[in-house]
Amino acid sequence: MYILVTNDDGYQSPGLAALRAVLSEIGEVAVVAPDRNWSAAGHYRKLFDPLRAWEGTLSDGSPALICDGTPADCVALAILGLLDRKPDLVVSGINLGANLGTDLLYSGTVAAAMEGIVFGVPGLAVSQIRPKDGQWDFRAAQVAVRRLVMLIRERGLPPELLLNLNIPAVTPETLRGIKVSRLGRRVYRDELVVRYDPRGRPYYWIDGAEPEDHCEEGTDIAAISEGYASLTPVQMDLTSHRWLEELRRWEWE
């Protein structure tokens, strides 16, 4: 199994090194990661700038290719020819923070895995909930990733499917397992913060409190709150099928 690994937190993120380490136990791994943090960049692609890539090392000293593009650029560049062959799976993460529910619309982590689908390669996005004490421990995430990717290797995934995996901030001993769940809803409480530079010109920050989570049964948010890792199948088709027939009944003539 040949696995392409990337992230959106940048090549020096400890989550990326932890992901590469566990996947190296399962298959052959190639890392192509961005040279900086692209959190919340979504599926941004650099269409009007050249891309550059060079050899480097991750935070644990393991080898990687570093790219000055976005997470999606890293995947496209790798599949289009930076690697010597097409990967069997694209895995993005381990993101330093949740990608639950509505977060997927913003997530560079998820977008990188989705870029694999554009090229016919199934994807896995991996994120870990931010620990309250700020001390990152990826062992539980590695347990969940190992179990899931071994099942993927055994059973396979269709090329149009992305799996979104979130892991709570727990130890391997207290992780209750993996629960398959649908996307939940997070309500963002953003605020516009206005400040002024020394010349009196305004500049802006978009800030705010933590999102309000709707912890409905069967959602990824509920699974995390119960101590499970959440696993959600995601597809590229964003069509609202419920509204297709309704819109067709509108008066178009």
UniProtKB/Swiss-Prot annotation:
Q: Which InterPro entries match?
A: SurE, SurE-like_Pase/nucleotidase, SurE-like_sf
Q: Which residues bind a divalent metal cation?
A: 8-9, 39, 95
Q: Where in the cell is it found?
A: Cytoplasm
User: A GO molecular function for this record?
Assistant: nucleotide binding
| Cofactor(s) named in the record | a divalent metal cation
Gene3D superfamilies per the UniProt record, alphabetical: Survival protein SurE-like phosphatase/nucleotidase
Q: How is the cofactor bound?
A: Binds 1 divalent metal cation per subunit.
- Provide the reaction this enzyme catalyses: a ribonucleoside 5'-phosphate + H2O = a ribonucleoside + phosphate
- What GO CC annotations are associated with the protein? cytoplasm
Primary location class: cytoplasm
The domain of life is Bacteria
EC number(s) reported in the record = 3.1.3.5
Give UniProt keywords alphabetically.
Cytoplasm, Hydrolase, Metal-binding, Nucleotide-binding
Q: Which HAMAP family match?
A: SurE
The record's listing under NCBIfam families reads: PRK00346.1-4, surE
Function per UniProt: Nucleotidase that shows phosphatase activity on nucleoside 5'-monophosphates.
Q: What family does the database annotate?
A: Belongs to the SurE nucleotidase family.
This one is known as: 5'-nucleotidase SurE
Q: Which organism is it from?
A: Chloroflexus aggregans (strain MD-66 / DSM 9485)
Q: Which gene encodes it?
A: surE
